[in-house]
């Protein structure tokens, strides 16, 4: 799987992701895979994903096809974007939205974190959009990343970027589906 992290501190937001791809017990590190990034620039912000590797292609193709990139300005704005993205995933990219018969709505089958000038956000696979005040993480190493963020966040010497990198590194240390190096991007908050 993956570990993705978003952090807000001061006037900076940071989004970080590991670079390991894994298929069962097979691990493919950034040393062997040229297109290993799990992050992409969208408008004035950045998006990171965890889930199937094809999610990166879907996101890049979908956002690249828009005349105007989304602003990612609020949970409602992001939800409206994700409704259209989900339809495109099914129609253009042949997404199989069936995860579990007990689900009340179809799944997009990947989770996303967003850093934009308006703040930091998460979108779950069932399109629940949350705005975070400090930090969050998704993926197989999320519990390690969240623990590191909780322990380090109040250190005045650490920026949002430093925290995000340390959180993914902590996940890589303890989670077999998370690997270094870390890709990290920052955004200046409004």
Regions of interest found by a model, annotated:
Residues 173, 187-190:
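Oxyanion-binding and handling regions
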Residues 114:
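N-terminal glycine-/lysine-enriched basic segments
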Residues 161-169:
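Small-residue (G/A/S/T)-rich helix-start motifs and N-terminal tracts that mark the onset
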Residues 1-100, 105, 129-161, 178-188:
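Conserved short S/T/G-enriched processing/targeting/catalytic segments and their helical context
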Residues 111:
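Adenine-nucleotide phosphate-binding core of ATP-dependent small-molecule kinases
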